Regions:
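C-terminal scaffold of the Radical SAM
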Residues: 1-150
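Residue-level detector of family-conserved "landmark" positions at structurally sensitive sites
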Residues: 4, 49, 155, 172-173
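Intrinsically disordered or highly flexible coil/loop and linker segments, enriched in small
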Residues: 138-139, 168, 198
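Short amphipathic alpha-helical interaction segments
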Residues: 149-164
Length: 199
């Protein structure tokens, strides 16, 4: 597995405090295209938005994330996702700082867990597609039902819009993100976000 994506300047890093000169969007696109061509020539296949591998060597760990699978967060600052038979989906975050993590572990009161929240039904479509549309492979419609616990009718209007915009194509059993959908991935994902209720 090889990841090929643009450097993100994160807060509290040397790059953040002393940012390098970054290429403009046209140069970034040229760099991405050149990398894509060289990887393809070397026998690597793109299987996620920024992930390449030799055939049969996709990162199973990443595939589980992108297919909205469950995983345990173990260690300082780790994140987890757990689905339960009663339909709940829970996101967890462990204590970030090692000293606090060890102190919480030693006290054994909800050991080393910093936050835990239930993913609301209205947030599940966005969470599902935010992960699933990172993959190049077609998305089985049944995966949406199986992993979110929601019927397809909850997203039909948005799916129809995405197809009309050219972001997705559809068969009776699958959705496929298009080249245009990859370019406008943020717009596509925003369409699945729950609307904020006004009070």
């Amino acid at each position: 597995h090889l990841s090929w994506y643009q450097l993100t300047i994160e807060p509290n890093t040397m790059f953040y405090y002393k940012p390098p000169t970054l290429p403009d969007d046209d140069d970034l696109w040229d760099i991405f295209e050149l990398g894509h061509q060289k990887l393809a020539a070397a026998g690597y296949v793109q299987y996620e938005i920024s992930g390449y591998s030799k055939p049969g060597y996709q990162c199973q760990h990443n595939l589980n994330y992108w297919r909205f699978g469950d995983y345990l967060g173990i260690g300082c600052g780790s994140h987890g996702k757990l689905s339960f038979t009663d339909g709940r989906i829970i996101r967890t975050t462990k204590v970030k700082h090692p000293r606090g993590y060890l102190a919480a572990y030693q006290n054994m009161v909800k050991p080393y867990l910093h936050t835990e929240h239930v993913v609301a039904d209205e947030d599940r479509p966005f969470e599902f597609f935010m992960n699933r549309f990172r993959l190049i492979e077609a998305c089985p419609k049944q995966d949406y039902v199986d992993t979110t616990g929601l019927p397809l009718s909850t997203i039909q209007e948005t799916i129809s819009w995405a197809i009309e915009m050219g972001y997705l194509s559809e068969t009776p059993t699958h959705w496929q993100i298009t080249e245009k959908g990859k370019l406008f991935l943020n717009d596509l994902l925003e369409a699945f976000m729950a609307e904020e209720s006004e009070e």
